[in-house]
Amino acid sequence: MAKFMTPVIQDNPSGWGPCAVPEQFRDMPYQPFSKGDRLGKVADWTGATYQDKRYTNKYSSQFGGGSQYAYFHEEDESSFQLVDTARTQKTAYQRNRMRFAQRNLRRDKDRRNMLQFNLQILPKSAKQKERERIRLQKKFQKQFGVRQKWDQKSQKPRDSSVEVRSDWEVKEEMDFPQLMKMRYLEVSEPQDIECCGALEYYDKAFDRITTRSEKPLRSIKRIFHTVTTTDDPVIRKLAKTQGNVFATDAILATLMSCTRSVYSWDIVVQRVGSKLFFDKRDNSDFDLLTVSETANEPPQDEGNSFNSPRNLAMEATYINHNFSQQCLRMGKERYNFPNPNPFVEDDMDKNEIASVAYRYRRWKLGDDIDLIVRCEHDGVMTGANGEVSFINIKTLNEWDSRHCNGVDWRQKLDSQRGAVIATELKNNSYKLARWTCCALLAGSEYLKLGYVSRYHVKDSSRHVILGTQQFKPNEFASQINLSVENAWGILRCVIDICMKLEEGKYLILKDPNKQVIRVYSLPDGTFSSDEDEEEEEEEEEEEEEEET
């Protein structure tokens, strides 16, 4: 039979609701709330999310102002407590006081958080600059599609200009920071010993070329002689009677500006008795002009790509040869030196020979070094009063302005030529320093620079001339921060080291991946083809002397 159980009724005479709290709900904190409150985030670990004070209480409860569930991180857990959050009316002074106190606390908290993560605390102006930098960086990445760190090309190890064999012994090692401190002032005035060759006159119409009146670069078939020191008949003749150190201007310029070089290069040194001969190896890339060698990100394409370092060097050399002849008044009157070109045979057509003159000069470096150098001029120019000035003509070429932080020459060359030469100085510092050293050694009055660009960025066979610029070598050396005293100091240091070596053949090699040059001793038989030719020449000279 069903039975009715009488429930327990709790009487609350002073109010409504139960008089006692059930056991399962005892000691549970309670915060009044409203179902109309906006829901905030479940968890926010980023700290101060809202910089603007207007949005600080965006998601806070509007019904109950309590913070019973708030967590305060301290050293122990005694901070879990119920606090009285009843709001009291504050005076205007108190409100301002609390506002400033909260701002100071918030600033101190941000400073502690930044110090915890080793972040730099910036002043207000620096913060604005930092935000502007980040904004521009994001804009640049959006426009040009800069790769992220995980997709960036790593710097590949560069190859040496010549393979170092196991039987080569290191005799000396010089690092660039040490060489950059060298200074030498005891350099005498140069003395001209012999001048050979003929020069064509510069066509001043090329000074009026602009980006709007660009001129196509023509392919000019002329012979350029790149004869090394020991193969020069004039130097062989002079070595019998005078001088104890012999070299060409290109070899000396490589040594004098070596601290700017990045790629590997090598120079052969022969110690014969008390004489030194600085040579270049046959069939080497010594005479090729590097492109963007000193840029932050030099070209790294491989294989047959027309933007590979070697193909760019061949393209630059081709451009330099053609421009140095096209800007002259070819086939017309020439300026002739007393002696003919020593490398031209009698049956050769004079118009097929490039306009180059050779000036053999002598310097005294102290009391013990008698230096003889073969220097070159590329052309001659007449002034307003008819005076003759010798010039060196070189070419800067644009291959792709999107690489190596370049600037578009067609847009900037006429209006902002300073920005163009500054970018070239950054990307081709070593090449410009070599050209300047060659002009200083030769005593040229001017250094002519031509600006040549590809007709199309994807076509490395056609080029256009966009303009020219003229510098005095001494002023240009100061402009590119080339110290002549340091250049002579490096050369004197290298000569002194080689003079201390025993008789034989040595190799000066720039390390491909470090700022170091080393002097190797070469065993007998190294570069045997060169040695055989030299022995044959010595035998022929001895036979001629016996006959006379």
Swiss-Prot record:
The modification Phosphoserine is found at residues 161, 528-529. Its main location: cytoplasm. GO terms for molecular function: mRNA cap binding; RNA binding; translation initiation factor activity. Residues 523-548 are annotated as: Disordered. Residues 285-299 are annotated as: RNA gate. It is found in: Cytoplasm. mRNA cap-binding component of the eukaryotic translation initiation factor 3 (eIF-3) complex, a complex required for several steps in the initiation of protein synthesis of a specialized repertoire of mRNAs. The eIF-3 complex associates with the 40S ribosome and facilitates the recruitment of eIF-1, eIF-1A, eIF-2:GTP:methionyl-tRNAi and eIF-5 to form the 43S pre-initiation complex (43S PIC). The eIF-3 complex stimulates mRNA recruitment to the 43S PIC and scanning of the mRNA for AUG recognition. The RNA gate region regulates mRNA cap recognition to prevent promiscuous mRNA-binding before assembly of EIF3D into the full eukaryotic translation initiation factor 3 (eIF-3) complex. This is Eukaryotic translation initiation factor 3 subunit D.
